[in-house]
Swiss-Prot record:
Family membership: Belongs to the papillomaviridae E4 protein family.
Species of origin: Human papillomavirus 28
Region span, Disordered: 1-70
Entry-linked Pfam families: Pap_E4 (PF02711)
Protein name (database record): Protein E4
Any one of the GO CC terms: host cell nucleus
Lineage: Viruses, Monodnaviria, Shotokuvirae, Cossaviricota, Papovaviricetes
Length: 97
């Protein structure tokens, strides 16, 4: 079976679109940490970092979304994805539904 029939059969399956996770609701007041304990840990942390005189490093960036360049539908319940990451890694993923 060729690629075009699979894309026509599943038009909403856009695997190249970036995926954004759903937004989380804020924690209720009883689930938040107490301000007093938070301030204590912050003051201890700031003293340790001031002695080293180093600027805090930003957290590492999340990798970019992988791009699916080619996918095929094999039979009624098997999909094969050919994934190419921006770093050059190539992965073939076969999913049996």
């Amino acid at each position: 079976m060729d690629d075009t029939s699979a894309h026509e059969k599943y038009p909403l399956l856009d695997l190249c679109a970036p995926v954004t996770p759903p937004r989380r609701r804020p924690k209720p007041r009883w689930a938040r940490p107490k301000d007093r304990s938070k301030n204590d840990s912050d003051s201890r942390h700031s003293t340790g970092s001031s002695s080293s005189d180093s600027t805090p490093k930003p957290p590492p960036r999340k990798p970019l979304n992988e791009q699916v360049n080619h996918w095929t539908l094999q039979g009624p319940a098997t999909v094969t994805l050919h994934v190419h990451t921006p770093s050059g890694t190539q992965v073939t993923l076969t999913v049996h539904l």
